[in-house]
From Swiss-Prot:
Leading EC class: isomerase
One Pfam family here: His_Phos_1
EC numbers, comma separated: 5.4.2.11
Record has Isomerase as a keyword: yes
Protein name per its UniProtKB record: 2,3-bisphosphoglycerate-dependent phosphoglycerate mutase
Gene3D superfamilies, sorted: Phosphoglycerate mutase-like (3.40.50.1240)
GO biological process: gluconeogenesis; glycolytic process
Alphabetical keyword list: Gluconeogenesis, Glycolysis, Isomerase
Residues flagged as site, Transition state stabilizer: 181
Domain of life according to the entry: Bacteria
HAMAP family (UniProt xref): PGAM_GpmA
């Protein structure tokens, strides 16, 4: 049984090297091209999806639209959930990662970006960026809305959704595409592969490259691989890893 994870194409704030989190930033022109390329790769490998799952953030939604349009699958059911949103970066959202590395040091920024259980500085409850002011989360209990999240927090909301909605669809024989974000995908991979906290620090998910997982009936990994040119994928992974370094 296969499932395809797709991190959205490059966003405008990815391009500007800013912490994005739950900020609803759109794709850059390069991100649109990455989504189109992802669709081409999936078509070339013969993928045809029956259902898709997506976050409620437009960079993932637009990536999914582009992919389904290019694959002539716009008609399939799409389920959107905030539980697939990017990790919430709290008060760091909107700030430049390299500038933060200069101010606080690369090690601190790496901990904020890639550690498992360290939470970045939280938003104040009256901060207009707090999700309680966003209409898309109006129906959710206030205590479920984060002011900041660690990867552990992200895993605790994504894994139940995987168990309740996504994996049952895979188990039923449906061909599933998940359009999400670097950290929500990292959280799911940590769960699927039973990765240690140390191992997850080094996992970097590039934008726009389909990641295929072959699973057994218990949801354990049998194999996984990216679609695309391996050299380009490695370069993209290195770019993700370098985002928290102080620029010279």
């Amino acid at each position: 049984m296969k499932v395809v994870f797709l991190r959205h194409g490059e966003s405008i704030w990815n391009r500007e090297n800013r912490f994005t989190g739950w900020t609803d930033v759109d794709l850059s022109s390069r991100g649109i091209e990455e989504a189109e390329n992802a669709a081409r790769l999936l078509k070339e490998e013969g993928f045809e999806f029956d259902v898709a799952f997506c976050s409620v953030l437009k960079r993932a939604i637009r990536t999914l639209w582009i992919v389904l349009d290019k694959m002539d699958r716009m008609w399939i059911p799409v389920e959107k959930s905030w539980r697939l949103n990017e990790r919430h970066y709290g008060a760091l959202q909107g700030l430049n990662k390299s500038e933060m590395a200069k101010k606080y040091g690369e090690e601190q920024v790496l901990l904020w970006r890639r550690s498992y259980d360290i939470v970045p500085p939280r938003l104040e409850n009256d901060d207009p960026r707090h999700p309680r002011f966003d209409p898309r989360y109006r129906s959710l209990p206030a205590d479920e809305l984060p002011a900041a999240e660690s990867l552990k927090d992200t895993l605790e909301r994504t894994v139940p959704y995987w168990k309740e909605r996504i994996f049952p669809a895979i188990l039923s024989g449906q061909k599933v595409l998940v359009s999400a974000h670097g950290n929500s995908i990292r959280a799911l991979i940590k769960y699927i592969e039973n990765m240690s906290e140390k191992e997850i620090v080094g996992l970097n998910i590039p934008t726009g490259f389909p990641l295929v997982y072959d699973l057994d009936e218990q949801g354990n990994k049998l194999a996984c691989y990216y679609l695309g040119d391996l050299e380009e994928i490695e370069k993209a992974q290195h770019r993700v890893a370098a985002q928290g370094k102080a620029s010279s």
